[in-house]
């Protein structure tokens, strides 16, 4: 499986990491600060960087995304070798960001906004269709989300193909919303292999931590790392995370013990990460 990005094919035979560069509307920070953060994520093991605006309530304003995100996209694209993704539902932001150097679109609305399908078909860049975070699941977690996820993604993929978007430019992300019950999230992770039937690259947004009744797990990252490894083993190609260094180290280690090919090179990669951490 592969993606065509920046005029070349990127193989996805091994898991990739997408660093999440989160921007807040009222945040005081220069474009150079975000470029520095992106470079740090690249050094820690990210191949991709996603740039998105996060608000406390509701959805970001289109004007805020244009003024805040596009300059950062341009600077990161010009100053790193990362594959830059823009996270947005607005066609105008998609167009401006791709013009500034983004080579991938992540749409939390799965191209349902007016003009989004036509814009992506015209831009001819890969797009990631994210599951609808407005769909609620019961608080007891007895509802298996996979039926809703499969039906939703099937409908959105069909809409993309009917709009003239090349199937080779489609990715899917079944991630549930932050407010979804942990039981539903774990059921989703446990059944990820079901989505292999779509035969499309799959991304997964991994949280800083996975909620758990145990306070120890609430405060530590171990559960999220374990879930990440299970996701990759179940067919996820790209992990989206703010915690790039920890995820990269876990994936490198998993690769080293899971793959018989080139174990020495993988082991050296792990050792170099430890050395960088101690040096800092």
Can you describe what each PLM-predicted range is?
Residues 1-5, 86-87:
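Short gly/ser/thr-rich secondary-structure transition/capping motifs
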Residues 5-6, 12, 27-36, 58-77, ...:
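Active-site-adjacent loop and "lid" segments of alpha/beta metabolic enzymes
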Residues 16-20, 47-50, 83-85, 103-104, ...:
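Structural preference for beta-strand elements that scaffold enzyme active sites
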Residues 21, 41, 45, 105, ...:
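Conserved, mostly hydrophobic/aromatic
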Residues 36-54, 231-234:
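Catalytic domains of carbohydrate-active enzymes, especially glycoside hydrolases
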Residues 39-47, 156-169:
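Phosphate/pyrophosphate-binding loops at sites that engage ATP/ADP/AMP, CoA/4′-phosphopantetheine
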Residues 48-50, 54-63, 77-84:
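Glycine-rich phosphate-binding "P-loop"
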Residues 96:
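Histidine/acidic residue-rich metal-binding segments in metalloenzymes
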């Amino acid at each position: 499986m592969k993606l065509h990005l920046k005029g070349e094919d990127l193989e996805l035979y091994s898991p990739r990491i997408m660093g999440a560069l989160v921007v807040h509307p009222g945040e005081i920070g220069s474009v150079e600060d975000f470029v520095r953060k992106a470079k740090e994520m690249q050094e820690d093991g990210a191949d991709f960087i996603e740039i998105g605006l996060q608000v406390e309530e509701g959805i970001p304003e289109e004007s805020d995304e244009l003024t805040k995100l596009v300059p950062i996209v341009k600077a990161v694209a010009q100053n790193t070798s990362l594959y830059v993704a823009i996270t947005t539902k607005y066609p105008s932001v998609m167009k401006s960001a791709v013009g500034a150097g983004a080579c991938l679109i992540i749409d939390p609305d799965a191209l349902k906004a007016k003009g989004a399908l036509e814009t992506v078909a015209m831009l001819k860049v890969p797009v990631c269709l994210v599951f609808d975070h407005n769909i609620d699941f019961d608080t007891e977690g007895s509802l298996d989300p996979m039926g809703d996820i499969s039906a939703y993604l099937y409908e959105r993929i069909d809409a993309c193909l009917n709009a003239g978007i090349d199937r080779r430019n489609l990715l899917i992300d079944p991630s549930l919303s932050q407010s979804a019950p942990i039981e539903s999230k774990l059921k989703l992770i446990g059944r990820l292999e079901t989505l292999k039937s779509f035969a499309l690259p799959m991304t997964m947004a991994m949280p800083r931590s996975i909620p758990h009744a145990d306070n120890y797990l609430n405060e530590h990252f171990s559960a999220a790392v374990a879930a990440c490894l299970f996701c990759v083993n179940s067919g996820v190609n790209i992990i989206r995370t703010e915690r790039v260094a920890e995820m990269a180290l876990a994936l490198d280690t998993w690769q080293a013990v899971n793959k018989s090919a080139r174990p020495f090179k993988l082991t050296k990669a792990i050792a170099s990460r430890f050395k960088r951490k101690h040096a800092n």
